[in-house]
C-alpha cells in the first residue's frame, strides 16, 4: 500500500467516484426513510443489498484495488470478479420490484430489456464478451485506450446485470425461472466462464503486453493516474511494484477469478436449492388429499 502512494491520493481513492456514490447512497437512504410508513416501502433487506452494492462498487472501482489492477493481473481479475459477479445481483436485489416495474415497463425499454434478459441470450452475451475481452490483442488495446476501456467496462457490467436478472429479480409481472431452471442456469454460467479462465491459468507464458512491456504498461497507467502525477513518478515497468513473477501473477489471477466465482455461485446454488425444496414441500402439502393430511397429523 505504501508503494502505491507515489501515485497520489486521487489515483488511490478516486474522490470523484466516492462523492458520486455517496450522493446516490444518500438519496437512496432519504427515500428509504421517507417511504418507511407507506405500502410501497423499501425493506431493510433491500437497503442492506443496495448499500453492499455501493460498497463493493467503490472497492472495485474507487479503492487502491483499481490502481493495483493496472499493476498486477491478479488484482485485475479480483476487480472483475467483484464488479461483475458481486455488484449486479446486490444492485438488482437492492432496488424494490415496484420501482423496477416503473423503469422496465416503459414502451421504449420493455422490448429491449426482455430480449437481453432472455436467459440463453444473457448467458451467451456476458460470457462471450467477457472471454473476448481477455483475448490478448483486445485486452491490450482496451487497457491503453480511455474510450475503449470505459466502453468495455460499462458494456460488460450491463451484460452482467442482464445475466443476473433472471436469477435475482422479484418482479411478479415478469416470468420467473423455476428453482430447477435456476440451478441449471447457474451451472451453465459457471461452465461457460471456465474456458477463458483455463486459457489464462494454463498458459505457459505471460499473455498481456500491458503487464510485460514497460511502454504499454506506462500507457495503461494513464487510465487511472492523473496526468500531473504521471510526470512526477519515475516509471520503469510493472516489476517496480509487483514482486510476483509475471506468469505466476497471471495464473493467480485466473485462480482468484474461479475462487470468487465458485463462492458466489455456490452461495446462490445453496439459497436457490433450499428455496426450491421449501416450495416443493409446500406445494405437495397443498395437493395432498385431506384424509392423508389427517393421517399424518
From Swiss-Prot:
GO cellular component entries: plasma membrane
Record carries keyword Cell membrane: yes
InterPro entries the record matches: Caa3-assmbl_CtaG (IPR014108), Caa3_assmbl_CtaG-rel (IPR019108)
Entry membrane topology: Multi-pass membrane protein
Transmembrane segments: 11-31, 48-68, 80-100, 119-139, 147-167, 183-203, 254-274
Compartment(s) where it occurs, according to its Swiss-Prot or TrEMBL record: Cell membrane
Keywords of this entry: Cell membrane, Membrane, Transmembrane, Transmembrane helix
Superkingdom of the organism of origin: Bacteria
Primary location: membrane
Protein name per its UniProtKB record: Protein CtaG
Species of origin: Bacillus subtilis (strain 168)
Amino acid at each position: 500500500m505504501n508503494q502505491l502512494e507515489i501515485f497520489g491520493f486521487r489515483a488511490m481513492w478516486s474522490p470523484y467516484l466516492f462523492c458520486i456514490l455517496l450522493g446516490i447512497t444518500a438519496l437512496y437512504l432519504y427515500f428509504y426513510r421517507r417511504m418507511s410508513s407507506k405500502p410501497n416501502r423499501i425493506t431493510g433487506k433491500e437497503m442492506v443489498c443496495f448499500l453492499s452494492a455501493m460498497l463493493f462498487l467503490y472497492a472495485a472501482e474507487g479503492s487502491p484495488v483499481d490502481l493495483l489492477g493496472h499493476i498486477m493481473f491478479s488484482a485485475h481479475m479480483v476487480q472483475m470478479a467483484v464488479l461483475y459477479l458481486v455488484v449486479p445481483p446486490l444492485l438488482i436485489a437492492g432496488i424494490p420490484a415496484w420501482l423496477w416495474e416503473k423503469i422496465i415497463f416503459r414502451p421504449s425499454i420493455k422490448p429491449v430489456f426482455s430480449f437481453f434478459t432472455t436467459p440463453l441470450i444473457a448467458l451467451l452475451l456476458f460470457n462471450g464478451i467477457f472471454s473476448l475481452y481477455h483475448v490478448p490483442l483486445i485486452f491490450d488495446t482496451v487497457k491503453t485506450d480511455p474510450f475503449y476501456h470505459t466502453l468495455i467496462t460499462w458494456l460488460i457490467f450491463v451484460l452482467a446485470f442482464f445475466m443476473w436478472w433472471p436469477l435475482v429479480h422479484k418482479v411478479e409481472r415478469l416470468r420467473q425461472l423455476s428453482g430447477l431452471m435456476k440451478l441449471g442456469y447457474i451451472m451453465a454460467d459457471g461452465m461457460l466462464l471456465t474456458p477463458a479462465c483455463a486459457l489464462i491459468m494454463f498458459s505457459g507464458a505471460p499473455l498481456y503486453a500491458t503487464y510485460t512491456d514497460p511502454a504499454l504498461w506506462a500507457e495503461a497507467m494513464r487510465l487511472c493516474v492523473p496526468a500531473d502525477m504521471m510526470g512526477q513518478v519515475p516509471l520503469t515497468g510493472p516489476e517496480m511494484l509487483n514482486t510476483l513473477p509475471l506468469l505466476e501473477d497471471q495464473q493467480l489471477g485466473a485462480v482468484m477469478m474461479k475462487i470468487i466465482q465458485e463462492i458466489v455461485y455456490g452461495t446462490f446454488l445453496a439459497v436457490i436449492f433450499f428455496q426450491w425444496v421449501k416450495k416443493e414441500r409446500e406445494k405437495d402439502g397443498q395437493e395432498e388429499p385431506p384424509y392423508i393430511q389427517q393421517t399424518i397429523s
